[in-house]
Amino acid sequence: MAEFEDQLVFNSISARALKAYFTAKINEMVDELVTRKCPQKKKSQAKKPEVRIPVDLVKSSFVKKFGLCNYGGILISLINSLVENNFFTKDGKLDDTGKKELVLTDVEKRILNTIDKSSPLYIDISDVKVLAARLKRSATQFNFNGHTYHLENDKIEDLINQLVKDESIQLDEKSSIKDSMYVIPDELIDVLKTRLFRSPQVKDNIISRTRLYDYFTRVTKRDESSIYVILKDPRIASILSLETVKMGAFMYTKHSMLTNAISSRVDRYSKKFQESFYEDIAEFVKENERVNVSRVVECLTVPNITISSNAE
């Protein structure tokens, strides 16, 4: 009976009153949607297109082995993938083919022949990027507007002067106040990016002589990425609980292991090294050198003398 009475009450409501009621409710809902703060979407960074390595700058035997001769350029991600999937065992250790065909230093070969494959010091898939990077070599020259320019670390001034003489770049006299400023065309930027794997830092196609000099200095600098590093003192291994191997008078550990061990001493909230770590390394790292992980790695290690094997 009660349900029937409710129905009678509902039926007695006029169409005008019902319309007013729903209109008010809808307006409230719209107001709530408008005033509600929507969570801001993170700005998605445009992914930079991956640089293609010219085929002639990749180790010829590697190119031939995987049939890459006709490629217009080889993505470094493809090289990484081919290295990881063809030169490592199922448990992620470098196999015998990799030891023969990839670019290893004499020291690395000696260490691999000394330690057991099960050792955490053995080269594994965490070292793929280093091994893949060694398969590409730096360009020694580039061509532009019918001219050939040679890249030599101790002759960068001559290179810049030659570019100016050939009018491949032009002096911008209006902008040249504290430093000589040059107009560098897009076509030359593309050539440099393709052959040297990075672009010079320009603004509106203008670059200073200092920046251009620094650019050529960086691209002609030899890549010295190491898998193994020499510790300055055996006590460092004890402080950081590192696995090591002794070769002659030197104590080696893996660069990645040392980096990870130091990174673990960084406080996740303050982003600074733990005080106890400061105390432990005080003898080896000066206070003004505790800038970041890579700087501390430099302070705890001896520069390696790299002699590459299997290079072409």
Swiss-Prot record:
Keywords: DNA-binding, Virion. Its main location: virion. GO terms for cellular component: virion component. Induction: Expressed in the intermediate phase of the viral replicative cycle. It is found in: Virion. GO terms for molecular function: DNA binding. Pfam families: Pox_I1. Each virion contains approximately 670 molecules of OPG077/I1. DNA-binding protein which binds to the hairpin form of the viral telomeric sequence. Required for the production of mature virions (MV). This is Telomere-binding protein OPG077. It comes from Vaccinia virus (strain Western Reserve) (VACV).
